[in-house]
């Protein structure tokens, strides 16, 4: 009899978890509290309790070739950076293609997930749900929690003296939907993450004046990178990742700063991070420099005091009149349906082995999928987590002893990747390629470059020097996809097909042949160094 698995949430990670369960012969039941799938990517005019919320203009920060499921590319005619409405359509295509909808119970809230009395032996869970005011209970062999971390807004009002006396309007960025509310207003956006910069830029087209307040600064980059290529297809390669992890941190930091400042000198724009010894998570915004240099957005430091109709920033005694304050101050995460003894959250951190498994459970039958913030796309990350987690739930893969897992968790908390700086979600950050490769190793699905070099050198060069696209994760092992090689070799074709409507014939450069030979030799050297 197939093991029954309860999946909480039908967003990007929930859909991947359903599919992974089916591939391993398990019986998934997904509970989704809203009336449709998509999670974060489904725009609604009103904020829904317990579900991530996005504004109308949201576009993906990772391009389509890097943010798809590993065996299901985006349609060729989709733009490289996908608007939320088309992203939702893609998720629906995925669900229909793999026949996932019949495993989802919509409008069903998970009220509680508790251990059964014999859980020490069976590992089973009792899941209590609510559908149309009717409560039901069922026993499951395992549970996969796929609710993400963008549902509980962090609103640190105590850190803003005088905020209670403010007579204007203030709200968290989670409440923001359209820029119309900013028309002819003086707006202050607090927080310089992706949402904060997006909202400041949008407001600047309608507002009288816009201030963007940041305490620590940030590295702002464009989606359009070298020669107009998508940023992550250039930045996210195995070759570059090897260099970043091999070279001394000061050298990596210097090289990265130099590269980032080629587009925008952050010091001149008042954006440079306060702590430059570490590289913070990138902020993706194509318009911000233009809005700053044309006097539409004003960068300011942290706030000293909030008055009835104004604020005072820390570098001045001048009062700036303000009508609306937007707190783009991030999120905390919690699992209200889980007992604290199952997953305890302290100081924004959950003690999870590989960001997935509670280390103290006697039976590894509960997995948290998608509670991570990689420097890369969430879809392939969550999907890879689900592929490994399902095999652990099934009993095919084993976890280390609890003591070993706890030791690693503690070490991770103390030693975050050195090229990330502090931010609200520091505890969730990870090195994208290194992390995914680690999970792929557990299921014997990590690409073997040495073997590939002998059997398919063209593919090996592309995998090592080209974009680390999700298709690489399906070249071998369980869940191998026969279309993976072709998807890798044609990824640049799909990237340019939608934008290169005007084609000019180009003469082949003799230098290209030299570059190919050089790349091949560089690959040999790199592989030799890896196996030293």
UniProtKB/Swiss-Prot annotation:
Tissue specificity annotation:
Expressed mainly in fetal and adult liver.
Cofactor dependence: FAD
Q: Which GO terms describe its biological process?
A: energy homeostasis; negative regulation of fatty acid oxidation; organic acid metabolic process; response to lipopolysaccharide; sulfur amino acid catabolic process; taurine biosynthetic process; toxin metabolic process; xenobiotic metabolic process
Q: Which residues lie on this side of the membrane: Lumenal?
A: 2-510
Question: What's a GO cellular component annotated to this UniProt protein?
Answer: endoplasmic reticulum lumen
In this chain, NADP(+) is annotated as bound at 60-61, 195-198
Function comment: Broad spectrum monooxygenase that catalyzes the oxygenation of a wide variety of nitrogen- and sulfur-containing compounds including xenobiotics. Catalyzes the S-oxygenation of hypotaurine to produce taurine, an organic osmolyte involved in cell volume regulation as well as a variety of cytoprotective and developmental processes.
Name the chain's protein.
Flavin-containing monooxygenase 1
Q: Which gene encodes it?
A: FMO1
